[in-house]
């Protein structure tokens, strides 16, 4: 049994390394997946002003990663949770923290996500696209945890900031596979194709929830280890 952790838009940071250290202390083999560095990406800013993303690799290219062999428990944060949705069939269980869903296709809707759990804060303002995706699923995640008062990125250590996050007008309905495969973290491309607006976004740590839900995940893995 291996645990794989996928980072969010900030790259590998404290959310990922804290989770790694937690599970390694319990005796698990843990792998951090870095899907940015192979494409020359340090982080994604999701800004419309001075800090714009201008990368030419597509999300589909970024999310084609080499997972370790064997049974995998996946833990994804934000954009890493979206990577988890894309590669869901590879995992025996899939824990998705505040998923940063960009768009979805018919093939994504046809997957069975009942072996997934979603953990999101009630104050996270960026879940509209995931919620639209969830409502169309025939086999949605078995568990959805809604954490009272928690904001996006609550698993990160010592973060408390606000910024104007760009929101592109990508349709909330089913997207053609070819169009999906053309999506890339490039502000000029996405804005010209879909338009954009900005939304004040809060990123804020919650250490209590972090420990609580890492502990819950570890207990579930241990309890169902023979099943996995």
Per-segment meaning from a language model:
Residues 2-67:
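Serine-hydrolase catalytic machinery in alpha/beta-hydrolase-like enzymes
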Residues 4, 31-34, 73-75, 95, ...:
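Hydrophobic/aromatic beta-strand patches that form the interior of the parallel beta-sheet core
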Residues 5-10, 78, 99, 121-122:
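Glycine-rich His-Gly loop
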Residues 47-52, 112, 161-164:
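Short, hinge-like loop/turn segments at secondary-structure boundaries
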Residues 57, 62-113:
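Primarily recognizes the serine-hydrolase "nucleophile elbow" in alpha/beta-hydrolase
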Residues 93-152:
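The feature captures the conserved acid-bearing segment of alpha/beta-hydrolase catalytic domains
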Residues 141-228:
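C-terminal catalytic histidine-bearing segment of alpha/beta-hydrolase fold enzymes
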């Amino acid at each position: 049994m291996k645990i794989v952790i996928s980072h969010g838009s900030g790259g590998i940071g404290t959310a990922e390394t804290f989770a790694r250290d937690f599970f390694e202390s319990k005796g698990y083999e843990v792998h951090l997946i870095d899907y940015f560095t192979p494409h020359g990406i340090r982080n994604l800013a999701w800004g419309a002003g001075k800090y714009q993303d201008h990368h030419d690799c597509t999300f589909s290219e970024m999310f084609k990663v080499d997972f370790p062999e064997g049974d995998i428990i996946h833990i994804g944060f934000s954009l890493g949770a979206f990577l988890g949705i894309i590669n869901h069939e590879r995992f025996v269980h899939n824990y998705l923290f505040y998923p940063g869903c960009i768009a979805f296709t018919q093939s994504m809707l046809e997957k069975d996500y009942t072996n997934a759990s979603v953990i999101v804060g009630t104050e996270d303002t960026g879940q509209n696209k995931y919620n639209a995706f969830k409502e169309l699923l025939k086999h949605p995640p078995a568990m959805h945890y809604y954490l009272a008062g928690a904001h996006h990125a609550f698993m990160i250590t010592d973060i408390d900031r606000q910024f104007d996050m760009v929101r592109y007008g990508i349709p909330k309905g089913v997207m053609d596979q070819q169009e999906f495969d053309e999506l890339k973290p490039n502000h000029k491309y996405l804005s010209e194709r879909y338009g954009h607006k900005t939304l004040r976004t809060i990123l804020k740590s919650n250490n209590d929830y972090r420990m609580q839900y890492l502990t819950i995940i570890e207990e579930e893995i241990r309890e169902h280890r023979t099943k996995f």
